[in-house]
Amino acid sequence: MTLPQAQLDFFTTATSMLEWHYNLERNKPGLLELTGVSQHGRATMSGLNDYDYQSLSFLKSDRTHNLQQMRTVTKSAIPNEILEHFKHIKCHCTMGLFPEIGRAWLTIDSEIYIWTFNQTRDVAYYDGLSHLIVSVGLVKPKPGVFVQDVKYLLVLTTPIEVIVLGVTFGESSYNEMQLMNRPVFVIGTDNVSISVIKGTDDGRIFLGGRDGCLYEIYYQAESSWFGKRCKKINLSQGLVSYMVPSFLKVFSEVDPIEHIEIDNSRKLLYVLTEKGVIEAWDISTSYTTARRLGRITQNDITNQAVSLITTVDPSIFKSVKAICPLSADDADKLHLVAVTQCGVRLFFSTTSLNVKQQFGPAVPCSPGENTGFGQPAVQPPLSPNAEAPKGLYLLHVRLPPGYTPNATTNKPKQVHAAHYTEGTMLMITTQQHEQDLLWSLSSAPSVNFTYLVESTALESLDGVVWGLAEVHEPSTPQRKSPLNSARHARKVALLTNQGTHIIEVLKMVDVLRQILLSCNGPHHEEVKMFFQSQNQREACVTALLLATSDTYRGSDVALWAAQAFMLYGGEPCYQHQKFLNASNRNMANQTLGPNTTNVRERQSMFMSTPMPNSVANSPVGFPGSQFNQPISPIGNMQPPQVAVSNENSPIVFSAKHDGLYMYVSRMLHSVWQMRCVNEQFCSNLSQSECALLLSDLRSLRSFLEVHSVHDISSTTRVSFDNHLDRTNSYNTIMMGNTLLPIPEQRVLSEQAQVEETRSLSALNLFVKHACEVISLWNILNSHSFQLICVQLSPEHQKLLTCSTFRDLLITRSEVCAFLIISLINLYLKDAAGVSEVSKNLRENCPNLYRHEDDVTYKATELLMNAKNCTSATEKEHMLRTTLHMCKEAAPTLPLHSICMQFISADFFEGVIELSAVCASKSDPEEVGVHFYNNGEPADDREGYTCFATRMAYYKEVQLMLDHIYQRVCNKTHVQDKSINPLKGTAKASDAKNGATQTIPKIVAHTLKVKDPLIHITLYEWLLAHDMLKELLDVVEPSLGEFLRRSVSQNVDNVVLIDLLWKYYEKNSHHSQAAHILDNLAMTRSENINLEQRIEYLVRAVMCMRNGNVGSSLSNGIFLKELEDKLDIARVQKSVLAAMTELASDKLEAATAVKELNYALYDITQLYQHFAEPFDLWECQLSILNCSHHNDPLLIESVWGQIINSVVDKPGTTSERCNRLFTKIEILVREYGESGVCFPFAFLIRELEVKACQLRFPEGIVPEKLVSMNLDIELLLEYYSRMISMNERVWANEGNEWHLIQSVIRVVSLLADNAQSIWYRSKRRIVGKAQDIVAGCLNICYQKPDTNRLQHSLKELQSQLQRLLI
């Protein structure tokens, strides 16, 4: 899934801002910084200055409106049926709370009663004990030990035994509580009374004994060879407790344990004894590794506190009455708060404080100074990130209200209970008999300070508090989110002797709601005061919490909160000035540009313990200098200096902008760096947590839809002059003191407005995207998440396991894509309908699961049904329906996937039509076609892009054809193996024949599409698979254009050129075909041999002689040229034949053979380069004849060489004779009518000479020449001339009468065949023969021994004479 570049840019902007606010939230000062411990590197104190405690009145200007810090939710009395049992009480009664299940309990002697404290119903009781109940506890069981119905274990102790009961509930959560009749465990106490019971979240049970020892009940599912199923272990004394008799323990000093508190986040346990001793334990994961970290006595605590504060009565530090663990969410470095009877809070840590390593370049303490107090003497250096607990160290002492110089409240007295929750300390004091007072000390309203400031509130209670615990809401998500913590008030249950009293510890969102309701809207000075007195970014976040709350949706409160957000959220501007004392100002509500730090709006005040003011001495315990402000700035204040702005001043975004980003950052804080899945591919975000996060995201999305980005960024815009006078503090700081002219300030303000609008647009887009991603995760959670992940490829699984939700929301959009694919495939694999899940995805993730995705999977479902359909008509209907759906969603479909499914269903037409539609919709203006038709110009980038896009779509057609071809090949291969196992492969021709049954149909369907580019795709495939016949069967003009372009681009490709002339010839373009054939014949290439060149010329001549070719002059000249080339080519063929005979013996001849095949040569080249150098006499004769060369001597010389070359070859006389006249007969047939190249007279004489020399049979020459159908009259004439010449050559050759013998044979042949002579020429020819015979007789008369010749001649004369009668 590729996001558009503009969207990616927006995401980059939003990500940068979110990361900045995320880090700001992570690095905000915690308790260690607020108490000054990190700045000093030593223990500190506070509570002596007036500003350490404030009431909520500082948030408002109107004193008539009283703001509540806590609110009573419900009050409920103890059920009457339980009170009835008080009449029968004998000796002991105690009460307490089970906040985990929303119930209170009461014991009366040996009976226990349990009821729901918010509605006083569902009363349960247990009376199965015979001894007095000393202590009660409720613990979660260990996983896998009991049946699932047992949700909790009720632990009851008596003086002699510990009883563990199983607790079950009805169908709905924590309703209809039932106690199991029989205990699951019963353990003896060894005569040690158990005063307190506490359990951990993982099911471990701890007991505090009156003997001062800490015990753990270890239990398991079954007994083993080495231990019981359940046993009690004394952690204080270890294994020795098993061997020491209990009566010996009475001689040791006893300090009974009064309280046990557990920090489940750190696996720490704290113990408070009756004498005020505090112990810290590292309980680890098993009793075998549990260890005591440290122990601090009441006297040690007092001494150390007095060393910090010497101006108060030391007695206030004595008698610790309550301990409250600080979880990892509450504080990072501080772990425990202890509260004394006078309300003094003592902050402890289990890690030592090392100045040099932990807090950077602060000045180290002298040896005499305290750096923390505790039992271990050695305090090794600790790492700054995750220090291992090593002891118990007092780091901060905070006095309660009433000790400041101008205190208006009384000091708390007789504190006997305390509870800490999210920055609020609740203390129960006894002011008068039978009535307690509730104190609330909260730091929530004072987030604007760099030191600990708390607001105080008091509320009278109806009776004496027996129990104090936080109410656990069943709907509360397990994973804490800063946003949900700020939105939902914590409820605390107080159990008094009158019943249960549930209060809410109100958050700042509740305070703003009170202000809006009391002011009846946002247009009031008190609302403005709220924004100005708070960190403005935080105030905007608070307003957003109200405006987006589901509780107040559609109400006036939500509307007023949105209006307040718009009115008092400020505007963006440029940071025009460089303040000399900028670090003493507060602009923490604004986000500055790069490399800038934030300053404070409110002036910080002196702290109880002086802190260094120099930047060099500021701590570096956490990143981000925006929170490391000097503690005592008043003495350092100097008059501000005016500075002229420069062009590179960073933008200061408005509080609205930063509030929105902070809101989203806190919303996603708990999942931002969390891995999406664990190693078992289970989602780390549960379905309930996912639903809650999704609800928050959708609420914000709705807010941004109602209040557009432009509205948010420009709501408070007024005329520029008025803008300068606004009471908005930071705008006044940034704009009011500048020396810039008004017009330039206006321009800068508008530029800042534009930048903020862009940033908010990015956030708006991110929120919408986040809604879709979390919606998708919610949908995935509602299915079998592990099964979905199993469907992924190993690469995708690895990517998913490495991804955090930050990656999922920002950079890993492909993860969402393949998860969707896996989900849909899961449905398709199970043959389940995808309509419902597709609809769900489309409604909730319209951009992640687009319309085309929906169509794709519906099409997949239809195609799967079509494959299984037996009815051809119904199958065709399904396929056509699928094609219609896909055409509507084109071109953004996963075309390849759908086409592959079409192919698997043998729906080839669908591939063609869908590809064509995708190409058409992607290029509606046919720019790509125009690019092709214009010859593909190199400078037309847009045209090339469209052309490439179309061709990419048509690639699917080629893949389809490949599939068909391969399928036929495989089928042929299988058939060949079944016939003959020795044949391993199928022949390509067989595959081609099989493919021809299907391919023509596809070709015809493809050619119906009017786009020439799909035709090109088809032609290329046919050409690549050597299906030339099918290609030439195409009659579309686009084929000719394709072939022409291909030839022009591949001038040496003979196959393409060959196809082009065939295309022209087939389509009656004979002239073009002839020209191409001519070019083919003349092409210099090793791929064309001479035989093919001659064939091309022959076809070219035939094309030009076709009747469709016009009789123009140019055509005639071209035809004559072709004929001449053909003649020369035939001569070259003879040269090649002769050269081939020599190639086996001569290397030069072999090279000449290649050259003769490589190209056509002219007649001169053939003679000079081949015929003459290699003595190819017949070829020379052919060349002379073809060129009409008129050089008788040269021609006679060639003939003589031919005759000599034949007779010079070895062999008998008969063989030579036959060989010679066979050659002469061949040459006569070729050149007999050629005139100059056939020197008849010379040929007769040469033959007669050779016959005489070689003693050929008498008269063989005339006999052979006559048999060659040569003109006998001309033959008589040439013999007559030779007789008349009477040369000596015959005598020299050894037969003086050889020529006369030949003449006798010539005349004899004439006389024997006289009937074949034309009667009009008969007398003339016979007369010439008589003259020759007479001449021969005359010669014979002159020579002796010629009687035989004379007799023969005379007989001839008589025979000739008879012919004339």
Curated annotation (Swiss-Prot):
Q: Where in the cell is it found?
A: Nucleus, Nuclear pore complex; Chromosome; Nucleus; Nucleus membrane
Topology in the membrane?
Answer: Peripheral membrane protein
**Among its keywords, does the record have Nucleus?**
yes
The protein's UniProt keywords, in alphabetical order, are: Chromosome, Cytoplasm, Membrane, mRNA transport, Nuclear pore complex, Nucleus, Protein transport, Translocation, Transport
Give the span(s) annotated as Required for binding to Nup93-1 and anchoring to the nuclear pore complex.
Answer: 1-508
Function field: Component of the nuclear pore complex. Has a role in the organization of the inner nuclear membrane proteins at the nuclear envelope. In germ cells, plays a role in the nuclear localization of components of the dpp signaling pathways, such as Medea and phosphorylated Mad. Binds to chromatin, and together with Nup62 and Nup93-1, contributes to karyosome morphology and chromatin organization including attachment to the nuclear envelope in oocytes and nurse cells.
PANTHER family under this entry? Answer: NUCLEAR PORE COMPLEX PROTEIN NUP155
* Protein's recorded name: Nuclear pore complex protein Nup154
Species of provenance = Drosophila melanogaster (Fruit fly)
Taxonomic lineage is:
Eukaryota, Metazoa, Ecdysozoa, Arthropoda, Hexapoda
Q: Which gene encodes it?
A: Nup154
